[in-house]
Design a protein with these regions (language model features):
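Soluble catalytic domains of enzymes that build or remodel membrane lipids, polysaccharides, and related
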Residues: 32-102
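Activation targets extended, charge/polar-rich intrinsically disordered C-terminal tails
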Residues: 72-179
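Glycine-rich catalytic cores of cysteine/serine-nucleophile enzymes that process amide/ester linkages
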Residues: 1-52
Length: 179
C-alpha cells in the first residue's frame, strides 16, 4: 500500500468549486491523506474523462524523508492556523511545490505561469529536474507517466498500486485478475 496526498479545498455540503470564488477567500485549504486507491483511484476509475499522470520524483531516500516531514509539519500548521485556498497563490499545485523546492537548486519564481496554472506544473517540474531522466524528452516522460488507462483496465483492486506503476503482476496475481 502506498501513501497519497492531495491538497485541495475543504468543501462544505452543497458547495461547488469555482476558480473565481477561489480568488476571494471562499474555501479553506485542506491536506487530504489516503491510500492511492482512494485518492488516485477516484480520478482514474471514477472520472474516466480525466487524464492522470504519475511522475517519479528525483530524490534520495533522505530527501524523501525530509519531504514527508515537511508535509507533516505543514499539515500540523494548518490544523493550528487554518488558511484559505487561493486559486493562484495557495492552490493544489503550489501547496505541493512548496515541499519539493529543496529538491532543486533553482530559485522558484512563484509568479511563473507554470506555477500559477496547474496544467503546466509537470513541465515546470521537468525543466527544474524534479522529474524526468537525463536525455529524456518531456513528451516521452509524459507518455510513459500516464496512468489513467492502466488503472481503468484493472479497477480499484488490491493490485491498483502495481498496475498504475506498470509493474508486472506475479503469476498468482495474474490468476486472480483472470478469475
Amino acid at each position: 500500500m502506498y501513501f497519497a496526498l492531495s491538497v485541495e479545498i475543504r468543501r462544505e455540503e452543497g458547495e461547488f468549486f469555482s476558480p473565481i470564488q477561489g480568488l476571494y477567500r471562499r474555501y479553506e485549504l485542506n491536506y487530504v491523506f489516503g491510500d492511492e486507491r482512494d485518492l488516485i483511484g477516484v480520478r482514474t476509475v471514477m472520472r474516466p474523462e480525466d487524464r492522470v499522470y504519475m511522475y517519479r520524483v528525483n530524490a534520495t531516500p533522505e530527501q524523501v524523508q525530509q519531504l514527508f516531514r515537511s508535509i507533516a509539519d505543514r499539515t500540523n500548521q494548518l490544523v493550528e492556523h487554518p488558511e484559505f485556498y487561493h486559486t493562484l497563490l495557495n492552490n493544489c499545485l503550489n501547496g505541493i511545490l512548496r515541499h519539493t523546492v529543496e529538491l532543486t537548486p533553482e530559485e522558484v519564481s512563484w509568479f511563473d505561469p507554470q506555477i500559477l496554472l496547474p496544467g503546466f506544473s509537470d513541465r515546470y517540474a521537468f525543466n527544474s529536474g524534479i522529474i524526468g531522466q537525463p536525455g529524456q524528452t518531456f513528451e516521452d516522460l509524459k507518455e510513459v507517466s500516464r496512468i489513467d488507462e492502466r488503472a481503468e483496465e484493472v479497477g480499484i483492486g488490491d493490485d491498483f498500486s502495481k498496475t498504475i506503476r506498470g509493474l508486472p503482476l506475479t503469476a498468482v496475481e495474474n490468476q486472480k485478475v483472470e478469475e
